[in-house]
Amino acid sequence: MQKERSPEQYQNAIHNALQDSQRVIKLIDGLLNLAKADYEPEQIKREEIRLDELLLDARELVLRAYPDFHVELVFEQEAEDDKVLTVIGNSYLLTTAFVNLIENNCKYSRNQTSFIQISFWEEWSIIRLSDDGVGMSDKDKEHLFQLFYRGENKDVASGYGIGMTLAQKILSLHKGEISVFSHPGEGTTYVVKLPHI
């Protein structure tokens, strides 16, 4: 038999149910995107993409989902040719990868901020995504791209251990590279290299 509850208790129950359903949706979306990242490269629709525009789109998606987050985008050097900012790839997948990286920066930083720097060198477009957060141990760095791995700082932010694996697979699918530089208490920097046209 159900007991009587106050309107406030019903509101809390509905709020909790909505949060649970949003978490399940995010988990399912992550798993579906992971499956897409496992496609053969020939199966992926590709086009020329301006990285600066893609990063602005990713920034907008993050800020829409998390209004308290801050994302700063800086160009380290002026591009004399648009080609150094243009890659061949799948816009949806690359946006997904960068949204995951930006969200991680913001979730684990002290002030919910991600600093993004764009530069280029030889055949590479280079994107550095940094935070001033809790950082990570060598053990966490070693397992960072392992599916479902949650590091020592898992209590700081919610997640499922899918985002970093997904980002790495997507970047690899685009002949890119990702590396992580971090020390406990000193923040984290992800360095992404993608071949430009």
Predicted regions and their residues:
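Short helix-loop "hinge" at the ATP-lid/N-box region of the Bergerat-fold HATPase_c
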Residues: 105-106
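Short conserved segment of the HATPase_c
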Residues: 136-148
